[in-house]
From Swiss-Prot:
Biased composition, class Low complexity, residue ranges: 27-42, 414-432
Residues bearing the modification Phosphothreonine: 431, 433
Subcellular location: Cytoplasm, Cell cortex; Endomembrane system; Cell projection, Lamellipodium
Protein kinase domain: residues covered: 68-327
Compositional bias ranges of the Polar residues kind: 1-26
Protein name in the entry: Nuclear receptor-binding protein
Protein family membership: Belongs to the protein kinase superfamily. Ser/Thr protein kinase family.
Domain remark in the UniProt entry: The protein kinase domain is predicted to be catalytically inactive.
Positions of the UniProt region annotated as Disordered: 1-70, 409-437
Length: 535
């Protein structure tokens, strides 16, 4: 079975060119994108650019290509080096992270733990968390390394945005603050709902990224499992005031440490900057207390103080904070409808909104709140919700800017039941297991199948075009024997990672239907048949 893929739809906008940022363990940190200029590049600059794009090595599957250009990870614990890389399947840039183990035997002692932890992290799927794509081990004679691929964030950190806002003598918008807090808490609630809970452990304004459209993403998690057994040593942490008081005092921290860090982020977002002690980056408790007193909204002040309780057990959970009066709002009918549309977008034609609104009377009443005691009726006209604004709102909901937090939040799949934050494991002498094939989870929204005769009565040629829910086209072809077992063929496509298991029965039905039509057409002196099935 051969395959070719193409990205048919580009993203609606590119991320802004912002300064570089530091990064948390395991997250894709940001290297400063080069600002374009009108002057022609010198031969030296062109040569340097070519050197940076040179491919140094590939992943075992051939999908990920490591470039020479390094990504600035600053002092990220556990990450020895990070490079820009290319995802050849989807045509996007990613980050190639490397963790060097000082000796091969050190990796052997940790192998089972490392695999269990990374298998968990790959399952994480949340719009407000930097995506963790893939990992594998590279074991040589006397050394070993673990390589993992993460999403590349071309936008800047929240810290940079806050600095720029303060530099321009602006204040923080309350609505923006609520929107950012909601997105961060939605991601933390997702991590903490795992069984066992996943603790981020390094949440600061430097490890939170903001895109041009207001989308917030927190850095993906780098497990402590790798931090104490790697070549690099943990250096003195900056931003110490973001770390809960119990850090270093107890062996096993809880999700409450993330709540403390979030509270400090929420405070910094509200006041733009917490003043440190002179040239030192150290922020004393007095400066934190002074910053809290600057908050005018008593609800906002109470919200942050709850997060910064010195006793971990007294801090609320991420889920509880989403319902705090400082943040919670009853979701509007517009937001509920938008989430319903986004959740069923594979069933709705792409131009449905345009078709519905093009012949609509804009002066007609869309919705009405009837009059009540001492209250005039309120009408909403179609003209108050232009199609372009609705399109943008749907795109924002689709991207995760307005998570629906009043209901049950999505929970991650957990294939392993291993604690992801504890580095303590018993030695293992098991041999490495072969790397499993990558499982396809994306839904196929359109299937097209064609069968043509190659050698009469001997073999046919099958062509499949699959359109996935993220607009990716997958083109597959193979020779088909007259006595081919169709269910086995569909099962093989699942096993090879071309389609998800959920689409196996649909594809089996499509193939059988097409083959029956082909045989009927062949008996009618025709030599090909085609059928299209759309979900």
């Amino acid at each position: 079975m051969s395959e070719g893929e193409s990205q048919t739809v580009l993203s609606s906008g590119s991320d802004p060119k912002v300064e570089s940022s530091s990064s948390a363990p395991g997250l894709t940190s940001v290297s400063p994108p080069v600002t374009s200029t009108t002057s022609a590049a010198s031969p030296e600059e062109e040569e340097e650019s070519e050197d940076e794009s040179e491919i140094l090595e590939e992943s075992p599957c051939g999908r990920w290509q490591k470039r020479r250009e390094e990504v600035n990870q600053r002092n990220v614990p556990g990450i020895d080096s990070a490079y820009l890389a290319m995802d050849t399947e989807e045509g996007v840039e990613v980050v190639w992270n490397e963790v060097q183990f000082s000796e091969r035997k050190n990796y052997k002692l940790q192998e089972e733990k490392v695999r269990a932890v990374f298998d968990n992290l790959i399952q994480l799927e949340h719009l407000n968390i930097v995506k963790f794509h893939k990992y594998w081990a590279d074991i040589k004679e006397n050394k070993a390394r673990v390589i993992f691929i993460t999403e590349y964030m071309s936008s800047g950190s929240l810290k940079q945005f806050l600095k720029k806002t303060k530099k321009n003598h602006k204040t923080m918008n309350e609505k923006a603050w609520k929107r950012w807090c909601t997105q961060i808490l939605s991601a933390l609630s997702y991590l903490h709902s795992c069984d066992p809970p996943i603790i981020h452990g390094n949440l600061t304004c430097d490890t939170i990224f903001i895109q041009h459209n207001g989308l917030i993403k927190i850095g993906s998690v780098a497990p402590d499992t790798i931090n104490n057994h790697v070549k690099t040593c943990r250096e003195e942490q900056k931003n110490l005031h973001f770390f809960a008081p119990e850090y270093g005092e107890v062996t096993n921290v809880t999700t409450a440490v993330d709540i403390y860090s979030f509270g400090m982020c929420a405070l910094e977002m509200a006041v733009l900057e917490i003043q440190g002690n002179g040239e030192s980056s150290y922020v004393p408790q007095e400066a934190i207390s002074s910053a809290i007193q600057l908050l005018e909204d008593p609800l906002q002040r109470e919200f942050i103080q709850k997060c910064l309780q010195s006793e971990p057990a007294r801090r609320p959970t991420a889920r509880e904070l989403l319902f705090h009066p400082a943040l919670f709002e009853v979701p509007s009918l517009k937001l509920l409808a938008a989430h319903c549309i986004v959740g069923h977008q594979h069933m709705i034609p792409e131009n449905a909104l345009e078709e519905i609104t093009k012949n609509m009377d804009t002066s007609a009443v869309l919705a009405e709140i009837p009059a009540g005691p001492g209250r005039e009726p309120v009408q909403t006209l179609y003209s108050q919700s232009p199609a372009l604004e609705l399109d943008k709102f749907l795109e924002d909901v689709r991207n995760g800017i307005y998570p629906l937090t009043a209901f049950g939040l999505p929970r991650p799949q957990q294939p392993q039941q291993e604690e992801v934050t504890s580095p303590v494991v018993p030695p293992s002498v098991k041999t490495p297991t072969p790397e499993p094939a990558e499982v396809e989870t994306r839904k196929v929204v359109l299937m097209q199948c064609n069968i043509e005769s190659v050698e009469e009565g001997v073999k046919h040629h099958l062509t499949l075009l699959l359109k996935l829910e993220d607009k990716l086209n997958r083109h597959l072809s193979c020779d088909l024997m007259p006595n081919e077992n169709i269910p086995e063929l569909a099962a093989e496509l699942v096993q090879l990672g071309f389609i998800s298991e959920a689409d196996q029965s649909r594809l089996t039905s499509l193939l059988e239907e097409t083959l029956n039509k082909f045989n009927f057409a062949r008996s009618s002196t025709l030599n090909s048949a085609a059928v299209t099935v759309s979900s």
